[in-house]
Amino acid sequence: MPVFRLDDQIWFPDPILADENGLLAVGGDLSTKRLLLAYTNGIFPWYNPEDEILWWCPKRRFLIFPDNIHISHSMKKFMKHTDLTISINKNFKDVIHNCRLLREETEGSWITDEMEEAYNRLFSQNLALSVEVWKGSLLVGGLYGVSLGRGF
């Protein structure tokens, strides 16, 4: 399968054309418009800081549907007796930044300055969200992602 080169125009090839690993395109930018088009088509950026932007669309994707989450009895019991608290959208900037920093202490991070700025823009437009885990007032964990429709 060919890998398509993106330019300044906001477009993507048909996701069915992704290679066997899911690589679909290279280039383009992380503008809000392009990211929205990407995510609505199951495409996402993932690349090393020294490389051009790579756009992926693997055949299988992990999605969370918040309306369908089932919290087990043991998890409810744990949550009732732990000093950890969970919040949503209380500190998006620190969640994405800390995800980046923790990776830098190991082998580097695919979350570049440009990526961090792009997802902060999405959050400011209510298109991304974060889940935070706190121990007292200390942020000890979290996740972030794009939320379009009922999927996250």
Predicted ranges, named:
Residues 1-152:
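N-acyltransferase acceptor-side catalytic subdomain
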